[in-house]
């Protein structure tokens, strides 16, 4: 089983968080390619000078955001009474992939996860 990274994980990687990098390396060495989403990349990418971020992303699969997913994400936001489209897309992507989520903000993603089937597990940094 792989994992989906949220923006907090990418920010930590960009800042050189050794624990995040070590965890990422272990996953890759085990043949598990982590996922993140294009909206998450857009949320954290600010400059081509973010070399650590770009290096980290080379070891990730980046899921797009389709119009069909947009309807599912919108329905999830309505059910959960939340408004963060990026977090909702992370949760929706994880559920679709049968994955769990690694996040720096477990409260928001746990609230979303409770409205998804199949359920996803939310892990905190």
Segment roles from a protein language model:
Residues 9-10, 40, 69, 89-90, ...:
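Alpha-helix capping/helix-boundary segments
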Residues 1-36, 45-58, 125:
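Short, well-structured N-terminal submotif of metal-dependent ribonuclease cores
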Residues 43, 72, 111-112:
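Phosphate- and divalent-cation-binding pockets in alpha/beta enzyme and binding domains
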């Amino acid at each position: 089983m792989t994992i989906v990274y949220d923006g907090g994980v990418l920010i930590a990687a960009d800042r050189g968080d050794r624990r995040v990098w070590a965890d990422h390396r272990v996953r890759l060495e085990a043949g598990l390619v982590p996922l993140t989403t294009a909206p998450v990349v857009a949320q954290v990418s600010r400059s081509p000078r973010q070399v650590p971020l770009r290096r980290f992303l080379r070891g990730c699969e980046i899921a797009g955001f389709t119009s069909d997913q947009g309807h599912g994400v919108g329905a999830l936001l309505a059910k959960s009474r939340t408004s963060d489209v990026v977090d909702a897309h992370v949760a929706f992507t994880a559920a679709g992939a049968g994955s769990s989520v690694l996040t720096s903000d477990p409260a928001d993603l746990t609230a979303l996860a409770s409205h998804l089937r199949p359920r996803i597990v939310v892990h905190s940094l």
